[in-house]
Amino acid sequence: MNNNNVYSLNNFDFLARSFARMQAEGRPVDIQAVTGNMDEEHRDWFCKRYALYCQQATQAKKLELEH
């Protein structure tokens, strides 16, 4: 994997985490619009990361509300 791909994945990961945080805060996120121009491989990877971060953000918010 070349450096450009690593940087792209880091950027996509940052975006997935950011959109998941927004979703957990109650802000509407249209993930189809976000991933609309991505090729299938990147869209699949991004959506999996987004789902993981949504789950983590939701769990963190629940823990925050419990304490």
Swiss-Prot record:
Homology family: Belongs to the GlgS family.
Species, as recorded: Salmonella paratyphi A (strain AKU_12601)
Stored InterPro entries: GlgS, GlgS_sf
Name the record gives this protein: Surface composition regulator
Pfam families: GlgS (PF08971)
GO biological process terms on file: negative regulation of bacterial-type flagellum-dependent cell motility; negative regulation of single-species biofilm formation
Top-level taxon of the source organism: Bacteria
Gene assigned in the entry: glgS
Function: Major determinant of cell surface composition. Negatively regulates motility, adhesion and synthesis of biofilm exopolysaccharides.
Residues annotated as signal peptide: none
Matching NCBIfam families: PRK02922.1 (NF002793)
